[in-house]
Amino acid sequence: MSNLKQLRTRIKSVKSTQKITKAMQLVSASKMTKIKSQIANSNFYIEAISKMMSAILAIDMYELSIEGQKFFNTVPNKVNLLIVMTSQRGLCGTFNYNIIKQVKNDIKDLENKGKQIKLIIIGKKGYEALKRQYANYIDSYFELSKIHDEKLILQVKQKIMSAAYNLEVSNCVIYFNKFKNAMTQIMTRQQILPVEKSKDDSTVKKYHYEYEGETLISNLISLYVNSQINYALLQNRASEEGARMTAMENATNNANDLISKLVLKLNRSRQAIITKELIEIIAGSEAV
């Protein structure tokens, strides 16, 4: 009987866990849908800014601006700024592992070349994975649970802009997971600085600039950096929720399979007990 009690307790426990994983799956699905909508709404703006930057590069307009040269030209022998986007919470499969693995590989390559490195880490999981080995490289760390997206984007942008203005960085790269679908997230390494020239110069014909110089370049650079961070953040959030939804769906299905096996085992144990009791009753009646 104690065995039956243990089985019933375990079944109850697994069912309770299954309810939690199912609820988390539904919450992540809802969040993912909302973020996908935000991505769709922001894509036009981000693409427009990127095309304008490519147009400026194509006609060498940035050479008219001292500020522009800081953002479009490589500054040799300065810091390599790596911005690492991870999640604040776990239970999302290999979502963070792929990012951390790539960052560690790139840091190793930069160290072998004798390059200077600085890290801006977004998300608790990335910080926990990198702080022990690369604490001396960490410039800033942002907890996603303690800061709004707008403020996060602004602060990261200010750090990038300040470093570029002061000629402190050779390049700036951002790591994030690009959303494809709920089951597929693509680890992405995207260069922010220096701004790369587009292979397609056809966009140049679409723009007519009313004025030139510092004001245009400065405003456009600020918008560009802001849009790149916003894009990476939205993609990473959608990927995180997709990964978590898939992980929780798998956990829910595994719990269902385990419950079926435990119920079968419970029924067999009950059947064995009943059969034993019947045999004892029959044996007792025959003895009388």
Swiss-Prot record:
Subcellular location as annotated: Cell inner membrane
CDD domains xrefs: F1-ATPase_gamma
Principal location class: membrane
Keyword Membrane: yes
MF terms in GO: ATP binding; proton-transporting ATP synthase activity, rotational mechanism
Membrane-traversing stretches: none
InterPro entries xref list: ATP_synth_F1_ATPase_gsu, ATP_synth_F1_gsu
Coiled coil start-end: none
Keyword Cell inner membrane belongs to the record: yes
Keywords: ATP synthesis, Cell inner membrane, Cell membrane, CF(1), Hydrogen ion transport, Ion transport, Membrane, Transport
One GO CC term on file: proton-transporting ATP synthase complex
Domain of life per record: Bacteria
Gene Ontology BP terms: proton motive force-driven plasma membrane ATP synthesis
Membrane topology: Peripheral membrane protein
Function: Produces ATP from ADP in the presence of a proton gradient across the membrane. The gamma chain is believed to be important in regulating ATPase activity and the flow of protons through the CF(0) complex.
Family listed: Belongs to the ATPase gamma chain family.
UniProt subunit comment: F-type ATPases have 2 components, CF(1) - the catalytic core - and CF(0) - the membrane proton channel. CF(1) has five subunits: alpha(3), beta(3), gamma(1), delta(1), epsilon(1). CF(0) has three main subunits: a, b and c.
PANTHER family for this protein: ATP SYNTHASE GAMMA CHAIN, ATP SYNTHASE SUBUNIT GAMMA, MITOCHONDRIAL
NCBIfam families recorded: ATPsyn_F1gamma (TIGR01146)
Record's protein name: ATP synthase gamma chain
Organism listed in the record: Rickettsia canadensis (strain McKiel)
Designated gene of the protein: atpG
